[in-house]
């Protein structure tokens, strides 16, 4: 089970669980770290998406995965060990805890030890649960990663799939962006979408009132209506962040599915040459 409820977390805060705040805001003046400093769930450790992404010079607005050694260094500095139970939350409309979840799985943390707080900080605060601004004490550790390279697709693999049609590609962006009706928010990226891809906005899997995932039955119906019924499914978006939301959603209805993401996403594929 990928999700943990606010009630479950509230009753297990004293357990040997590493709590991570993965808040990040897309093209915004808001700072996830500054907001974390002002308020967070007790003992939460901040995860910086920008610092834990591999920025390529020709694609500065994308979020490629970090190098294995950099991931090990970052998690060791955060005091996380391979045997730790991880619960991730965020205060982001984009549900960036899902991207953090994906990175943990990609770098080999056991799936049964990585969870997302359903509803994140928004739901936690709506229920008047305890928050703090106290600094979390961290004892550095030694983390060892192992890459699951089958969990990502490259641009070349996406192009080959247009001909071979070996998997379905779902795009988590809004329909307006997918159909090219609006300008892309990132500079140097054209409007539109990848040939033969299917649009399922990540927001259609989320309850906007409290940022929790919709009922499994509703999510299942959404995927089935698009012909997604097996593990040959890959997710994409603008920069491989919200694609992870669909990865989580699909894992809720298919416990044999390990998320696969086109890591370059549209900001790579749609780059204006």
PLM regions: where:
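Short, glycine/acidic-enriched loop or turn micro-motifs at the edges of active sites
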Residues: 24-26, 51, 174, 204
């Amino acid at each position: 089970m990928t999700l943990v409820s606010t009630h479950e977390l509230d009753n297990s805060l004293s357990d040997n669980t590493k709590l991570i705040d993965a808040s990040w805001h897309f093209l915004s003046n808001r700072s996830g770290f500054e907001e974390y400093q002002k308020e967070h769930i007790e003992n939460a450790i901040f995860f910086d998406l920008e610092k834990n992404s591999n920025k390529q010079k020709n694609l500065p607005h994308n979020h490629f995965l970090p190098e294995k050694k950099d991931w090990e260094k970052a998690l060791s500095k955060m005091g996380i060990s391979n045997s730790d139970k991880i619960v991730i939350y965020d205060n982001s409309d984009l549900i960036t805890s899902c991207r953090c979840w994906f990175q943990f799985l990609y770098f080999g943390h056991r799936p049964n030890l990585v969870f997302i707080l359903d509803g994140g900080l928004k739901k936690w605060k709506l229920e008047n649960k305890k928050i703090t601004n106290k600094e979390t004490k961290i004892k550095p550790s030694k983390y060892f990663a192992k890459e699951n390279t089958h969990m990502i697709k490259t641009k070349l693999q996406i192009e080959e799939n247009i001909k071979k049609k070996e998997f379905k590609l779902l795009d988590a962006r809004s329909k307006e962006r997918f159909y090219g009706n609006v300008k892309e928010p990132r500079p140097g990226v054209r409007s539109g979408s990848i040939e033969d891809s299917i649009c399922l906005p990540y927001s259609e899997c989320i309850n906007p009132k409290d940022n929790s995932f919709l009922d499994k039955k509703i999510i299942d119906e959404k995927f089935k209506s698009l012909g997604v019924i097996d593990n040959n499914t890959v997710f994409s978006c603008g920069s491989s962040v919200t694609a992870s939301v669909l990865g989580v959603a699909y894992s809720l209805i298919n416990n044999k599915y390990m998320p696969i993401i086109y890591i370059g996403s549209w900001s790579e594929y749609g780059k204006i040459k």
